Amino acid sequence: MHNFIYITAPSLEEAERIAKRLLEKKLAACVNIFPIKSFFWWEGKIEAATEFAMIVKTRSEKFAEVRDEVKAMHSYTTPCICAIPIERGLKEFLDWIDETVE
């Protein structure tokens, strides 16, 4: 099985640092990074922030390692690190993830 792991970070620099670490450790085949505007509840009030979202492409069994690695590097006390199962996909793409992630 395969996952997209959705992660948010407060800056492009932090997102890139996390992405590079996951790739260097072969925990991800690819990481997409894009800017987002987030609205959320925090400490009893609605907040808004510019953040950077990451989509990590990996194997399902790597979730715990990715989560632990990201949590150790992340500046947020409660970072968004959520796995989204890939139910179907192009076989060659999924094979590439399998071949790339160790």
UniProtKB/Swiss-Prot annotation:
SUPFAM superfamilies reported in the protein's UniProt record: GlnB-like (SSF54913)
A Pfam family that the UniProt record links to this protein: CutA1
GO MF, one annotated term: copper ion binding
InterPro entries: CutA_tolerance (IPR053426), Ion_tolerance_CutA (IPR004323), N-reg_PII-like_a/b (IPR011322), N-reg_PII/ATP_PRibTrfase_C (IPR015867)
Record GO biological process: response to metal ion
Protein family according to the UniProt entry: Belongs to the CutA family.
Functional note: Involved in resistance toward heavy metals.
Name of the protein in question: Divalent-cation tolerance protein CutA
